[in-house]
UniProtKB/Swiss-Prot annotation:
Residue ranges of every copy of the Toprim domain listed in the record: 182-268
Cofactor(s) the protein requires to work: Mg(2+)
E.C. number(s) listed in UniProt: 2.7.7.101
InterPro entries reported for this sequence: DnaG_primase, Primase_DnaG_arc, TOPRIM_DnaG/twinkle, TOPRIM_dom
Pfam family, one: Toprim_4
Entry annotated with the keyword Isomerase: no
UniProt family annotation: Belongs to the archaeal DnaG primase family.
Described function: RNA polymerase that catalyzes the synthesis of short RNA molecules used as primers for DNA polymerase during DNA replication. Also part of the exosome, which is a complex involved in RNA degradation. Acts as a poly(A)-binding protein that enhances the interaction between heteromeric, adenine-rich transcripts and the exosome.
Protein source organism: Archaeoglobus fulgidus (strain ATCC 49558 / DSM 4304 / JCM 9628 / NBRC 100126 / VC-16)
UniProt protein name: DNA primase DnaG
Length: 399
């Protein structure tokens, strides 16, 4: 560790990746000098927080930067200020700041350290960048004058686009406010995250494909989730997968045919204002689906769908038999239950329902969904993890 004294300041190895700057004040009952303060900081915090937050180790690895100490004595007492730069995250920086306040002695004297504030260095830099950019635009460009508010917005949008981070074990593209926000917005890809950041929305994270990452699933258990997806079939597919594995609270969609990454600020805000609770979405989907089913079954004016399925249930119950039904709920094929999976796999039949005297398994649900069936009716549910929204699963006792 290297240290030197310049103009009353003790400095240590600099760190150009500083995120936060701890500002603290110190007061000692007696005359103390700078080396006493530094010795107390390192000596009295050593071993206090374990190896991961040991000050000496943090400085060796560059996770804390130059420590500034300024102190003066007056009337037999000493007063001063301490600044500790940190490239740790918010929580670790706060713990480090709290550790400073546990120091009770400096040299031979009783002392007290109090944290005054923790400065977000990057936020301060961004503010200076905006102010300097405004001056540069005014001084060095001969174009017609731009309103100050517009200049600020242009520069801020550019800066926000640089705020993208990698989040979770899958290193998902995200805004910087995921951890601190109670609500998050889930989008499809990195370009969507960048567009929302550009317009000031920081609690956004991308799934990066149709296979929903574990990080998204875990976040959905703790936070209010709005799925904000493209207004096309790709958005439909991602939404379907999200609803199966994650706890989604609201759904927002881009205008039909548009992608989230191309939306203007006005379109983004309008889409988010018009978000729909997921419960309402299911009702709308159910009504639309039942409407399609009524059209398919137009040739059956007297019997409801439930009545017809109930009749088929009575026919297979106790016989270990399965029936595959067409769009009008007429029997296409009747087979032993043990042959049902094999028949569905090997036959390219287009049916509407499966009614069988057996247990509804995840394997059978996946196969029925793949074959685009609308209903599957069985004795009871087995170990089922997820059910596609396109398939309605019914047990005998529900009919």
């Amino acid at each position: 560790m290297s240290s030197d004294m310049e103009g009353g300041m003790i400095t240590m190895k600099a760190n150009d990746t500083t995120k936060y700057l701890i500002h603290a004040e110190i007061e000692a009952e007696g005359v103390v000098e700078r080396p006493d303060v530094v010795g107390a900081i390192f000596g009295q915090t050593e071993g206090l927080l374990g190896g991961d937050l040991d000050l000496r180790e943090l400085q060796k690895t560059g996770r804390i930067g130059r420590i500034e100490v300024k102190i003066e004595s007056k009337g037999g007492r000493s007063f001063g200020e301490i600044k500790v730069p940190s490239s740790l995250d918010k929580v670790e920086t706060a713990i480090l700041a709290a550790a400073l306040e546990t120091i009770e002695r400096v040299g031979p004297c009783s002392a007290k350290i109090k944290v005054l504030k923790i400065e977000d260095v990057r936020a301060s830099k961004r503010k200076r960048i905006v102010e300097r950019a405004m001056n540069i635009l005014r001084e060095h460009f001969e174009e017609p004058e731009i309103e100050s508010e517009r200049i600020v917005e242009i520069v801020r949008q550019a800066i926000r686009a640089d705020e993208i981070v990698e989040y979770g074990e899958e290193k998902l593209p995200a805004g910087p406010a995921i951890d601190e926000s109670d609500a998050i917005i889930v989008v499809e890809g990195r370009a969507d995250v960048l567009n929302l950041l550009k317009h000031g929305i920081k609690n956004v994270i991308a799934v990066e494909g149709t296979n929903i990452p574990k990080t998204i699933v875990e976040l959905s258990k703790k936070k209010t989730v709005t799925a904000f997806l493209d207004g096309d079939r790709g958005g439909d597919l991602i939404l379907k997968e999200l609803l199966q594995v994650a706890e989604v609270d609201y759904v927002a969609r881009a205008p039909e045919g548009k992608e989230v990454e191309d939306l203007t600020q006005k379109e983004i805000l309008k889409s988010l204002r018009n978000k729909v609770p997921v419960e309402q979405l299911h009702v709308l989907k159910k009504e639309a689906k039942e409407g399609r089913e009524r059209e398919k079954l137009a040739e059956m004016p007297k019997d409801s769908i439930s009545d017809v399925l109930r009749k088929h249930t009575e026919s297979v119950k106790g016989r270990l038999t399965a029936r595959v039904l067409d769009r009008n709920l007429n029997v296409i094929k009747e087979v032993p239950v043990r042959d049902l999976v094999k028949i569905l796999k090997t036959n390219n039949m287009k049916g509407s329902a499966i009614v069988f005297d057996g247990i509804i398994t995840q394997r059978l649900i996946d196969l029925a969904a793949k074959k685009e069936f609308d209903y599957i009716v069985g004795v009871r549910l087995g170990s089922v993890v997820k059910v596609p929204t396109s398939l309605r699963v019914i047990t005998f006792d529900q009919l």
